[in-house]
Amino acid sequence: MNKEEILKIIQELNEKQNETICIETKTAKAGKPEKYYDTISSFSNTMGGIILFGIEEKKQKNETTFKVVGVYDANDLQKSITNLCSKEFEPVVRPEINIVNIDGKNIVAVRIDVLNQRSKPCYYKPKGLHNGSYIRVGDRDDNMTEYEIYKCISYRENVKDDLMPVVRATMKDFDEKILGKFIENAKTNKPKLSEFSDQEILLNFGVLTEVEDKIFPTVAGIMVFGKYPQKFFPQWFVAAIVIPGFEIADLGEEGQRFDDNKRIEGNIPEMYEETIAFINRNMKVKVIISDKTGLRTDITQYPKDALREAISNMIIHRDYSQFKTGVYSMVTVYKDRIEFRNVGNLYGSNTIELLQTRKAMEVRNETIVKLLETLGGIIENRHTGISTMQKKMEMANLPEPIFSNEREDFVVTFYNGEYPELYPEELKEEQLDIEKTYEKTYEKILQFCVEERTAREIAEYCGYKGIDRFRRTYIKTLLEQGKIKMTIPTQPKNRNQKYIINN
């Protein structure tokens, strides 16, 4: 890095009055900082970043400033950083280090590149894998959860969760009709399979697995062909609800919390069909009669092809690992939108940008996908789901779908366009530049909260109507960082609760 680049970063930090998801500052004027290994780990595990040593962050009342103060000894600090990265991390971190003089003061700029997915997690060896692995969240370094560490290791070691045995299950737990159709299709598609027994076919396709000379159904087999998978996995269902308003806490005219509410169970094909039926009966349909032909055309509130893709992705590509046995998928129908919450965020090295192309992508549940392809009916085209959603929404003259890769979930949101004044245009940026959107919103909140504000006031000021999601995403984060505080801290859920910047 050169002087101009560093000065530009400092200027941006002063404008935002905050560090960012990829920029961290350390003073190091009087000596080596006591702790920065967490930032090296978090940058390596998240999206990379730059640590600037020799920058002082100073907080005064309503203002935070970043000032060049220089480091105690640039060469000694550089050696210390190099030794730390090469000896104390697994895997070894190879930083790019530059010493830049600004107004007679030395700045040590350390660039940390994000590791490829198969090398994660990067952890600080003295604290061990489970205590020394970090991830960057906003401007802070958080310990990775057990689940986040498991995702990295299972991906690296090519663990297939959908091939895990269901030891309590037997062949009697399969739906014979669906399984028979699958075997017939498999033999038709691959005539050589006619030479195999049915059990051999099921073993080859991953419907069954052999463990210590015993045959068990797999997770994939039970979820695709099971009579009642929830016998073994009670929480692997779809919770479908209709909210009589624009946010989860809104009540209807008669005080009802939900206009419709259903627990959708069964195997994957059954949950897929029932979820489609649930949405169909809870969305508006416009009927148009042609003046010329007299023929009737039904136009649904949301395009059916887009809905089918969102539902199939949510059920098929959810996380079926041991860490998510207690978590269900969720469809929430609001007045202005539908949200599909997929258990587990994007798999492996997939990104939102990659999802919007037709390039081959990594698949979390390869066996489930293969079984459904052979069975037919749900999966028709590989790797076109996201582009299909976008195309169908565009053809219906509806807002572009929103794809949000959260820490442990992946959320798809369709807006129906009936309340354009409520549609958060700013959310579009989230798909391409998460950091920009988040940091911009954080900045607006801090500027607005120089006076006491309610959560609704803050959300509306920032252009959001989904108060609950806004509270989880932004207000909670700023509270945890100590940048804002509650006016009634002893009663967090008090209806008169307000927020103000923390001086």
Could you tell me what each predicted segment is?
Residues 1-109, 116-118, 305:
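Polybasic/polar functional segments that serve as interface/processing modules
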Residues 91-171, 325-327, 383-387, 391, ...:
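Intrinsically disordered, low-complexity regulatory tails
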Residues 133-325, 330-336, 341, 347-361, ...:
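Active-site helix-to-loop segments that bind/position phosphate- or nucleotide-bearing substrates
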Residues 448-457:
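Short capping segments at the starts of secondary-structure elements
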Residues 465-480, 493:
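Short amphipathic alpha-helical interaction segments
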Residues 487-503:
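Short, cationic-aromatic polyanion-contact patches
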